[in-house]
Curated annotation (Swiss-Prot):
The lineage of its organism: Eukaryota, Metazoa, Chordata, Craniata, Vertebrata. The modification Pros-methylhistidine is found at residue 238. Methylated at His-238 by METTL9. Keywords: Methylation, Phosphoprotein, Repeat. PROSITE patterns: ARM_REPEAT (PS50176). PANTHER family: ARMADILLO REPEAT-CONTAINING PROTEIN 6. This is Armadillo repeat-containing protein 6. The gene is Armc6. It comes from Mus musculus (Mouse). InterPro entries: ARM-like (IPR011989), ARM-type_fold (IPR016024), Armadillo (IPR000225). ARM repeats lie at residues 195-239, 249-293, 294-336, 337-379. The keyword Repeat applies. It holds the Pfam family Arm. The modification Phosphoserine is found at residue 39.
């Protein structure tokens, strides 16, 4: 059942009542109001839990700091006082950054059209002011993508196109794109139609020495491939990934950027994460190889083993491109299996690295007996079982390890005994008992290992009907 909601005014009135009628102190009054509403099942996540303040001139009704900043901004815009507009934009932005509730309250009180007016005023006269307006809009739309309208969308694309050489404006504009597209499929589709994809890939190329721009552009490109909006039956994630690769040379752009940032683990993590989102077709996986991407990934896995997040993203990218059977063999020939096993062993305490390592090895072993032999001889099965022991409560690790073991032996029964001798059966049975999600994969692994498996009929016929 959906949580109950109240307005900011209702909460403020309750706090004021506690102070005036029950003579409570400020903190006690707020705490009492919070407890009162939460006991009634009210969601207060979008409520500012402070006392409204009196304005500096004392002429206005007490209001929250973010709304005071918004009112002052609107007044300065009415008089086109650019210096004051600049100061109030900074102040408003600082208030919105403090908490989600402040952004929500500002949006409820008409902040978006006011920022749009500041944006339009700055676009024709002042790049410094334009940057401040864009920054404020990026903060306001964080978690509130519904605010974007058609006017703002076209203004955003035009701003990116007209200021492509400006590093700060490009970075801030792309951050706006990311915020308004996250969990909003219609905004994604509309921005793609308006031509945002070539602007994103061009930003990586044009600002290839600026880590912040590359990081933001990668993040925005990934968001374009998300299917995270529960309000639509299906999205265009696959189509957007195809457009990024085929029409905008996305893979080439990312791989060239990886070469340029070879000593920056943070940027490399973003690039690898984006690469894995774009490897959605067989030919795209092969293109990564043709562009020299495999060598970069394997080298990163070997040379950057100390950077856990980068290791995780490289493993994810290897897993993605290994969907192509020819690429599987290329990864094995390049020494990828040894590097994956080494990464899992090095980061055995990390469930995320263990899960991604098992998943990557699982894909490499699928339908490939020769690859299975290389993995087992390189200690892959042992490492996977060690990961299962280290993370018994992590369903993802248990599931991927079971799938890996199944793939290792499904076409190479000769490997069953060595894996069983390592204690695989007991670990798989434990995973099956502890995690319902592992039921099918655990059963498949036990079956292909030659262990006794109790099979249960899911459906039985009864006088022409199916019954569970």
């Amino acid at each position: 059942m959906a949580s109950k909601r109240i307005t900011q005014e209702t909460f403020d009135a309750a706090v004021r009542e506690n102070i005036e009628e029950f003579e409570m102190g400020t903190e006690e009054a707020i705490r009492e109001a919070v407890e009162q509403f939460e006991s009634q099942g009210v969601d207060l996540s979008n409520i500012v839990k402070t006392i409204p303040k009196v304005s500096l001139d004392g002429l206005q009704e007490p209001t929250h700091s973010v709304l005071q900043a918004l009112n002052d901004l609107q007044e300065s815009l009415t008089g086109s006082r650019l210096q004051e507009v600049s100061a109030h934009l900074v102040r408003f932005c600082d208030q919105c950054k403090q908490q989600k509730a402040s952004r929500y309250l500002a949006a409820q009180k008409g902040a978006y059209p006011i920022l749009l007016a500041a944006w339009q005023l700055a676009a024709t006269s002042n790049q410094g002011l334009l940057l401040q307006a864009l920054n404020a809009l990026a903060v306001l739309t964080d978690g509130q993508p519904d605010l974007l309208d058609a006017q703002g969308l076209h203004l955003l694309v035009a701003t990116l196109a007209q200021n492509a050489a400006n590093t700060e404006l490009t970075c801030c504009g792309i951050r706006c794109v990311r915020h308004v597209c996250l969990k909003h499929e219609q905004n994604r589709q509309d921005l793609v139609k308006a031509g945002v994809l070539p602007l994103l890939t061009a930003a990586i190329t044009q600002h290839g020495q600026h880590a912040d721009v590359v990081r933001e552009a990668c993040w925005a490109l990934r968001v374009m491939t998300f299917d995270d909006d529960i309000r639509v039956p299906f999205g265009h994630a696959h189509e957007h990934a195809k457009m990024i690769v085929q029409e905008n040379k996305g893979l080439k752009v990312l791989i060239e950027a990886a070469r340029a940032f070879s000593d920056n683990p943070g940027v490399l993590s973003e690039l690898c994460s984006t690469l894995s989102r774009l490897a959605v077709r067989n030919e795209f996986c092969q293109e990564v190889i043709d562009l020299g991407g495999l060598g970069i990934l394997v080298t990163l896995l070997a040379d950057c083993n100390d950077h856990q997040d980068l290791v995780k993203q490289v493993l994810s990218a290897l897993r993605a491109i290994a969907g192509n059977d020819d690429v599987k063999d290329a990864i094995v020939r390049a020494g990828g299996t040894e590097s994956i096993v080494a990464a899992m062993t090095r980061h055995l305490a990390s469930p995320q690295v263990c899960e991604q390592s098992c998943a990557a090895l699982c894909v490499l072993a699928l339908r490939k007996p020769d690859n299975s032999r290389v993995i087992i001889e390189g200690g892959g099965a042992l490492a996977a079982l060690q990961a299962m022991k280290a993370h018994p409560q992590e369903a993802g690790v248990q599931k991927q390890a079971c799938m890996l073991i199944r793939n290792l032996v499904s076409r190479s029964q000769v490997f069953s005994k060595p894996i069983l001798d390592l204690g695989a059966e007991e670990l798989i049975l434990q995973a099956r008992a502890a995690h319902p999600d592992c039921e099918d994969v655990a059963k498949a692994a036990l079956r292909d290992l030659g262990c006794r498996v109790e099979l249960r009929e899911l459906w039985t016929g009864k006088k022409g009907d199916l019954a569970l």
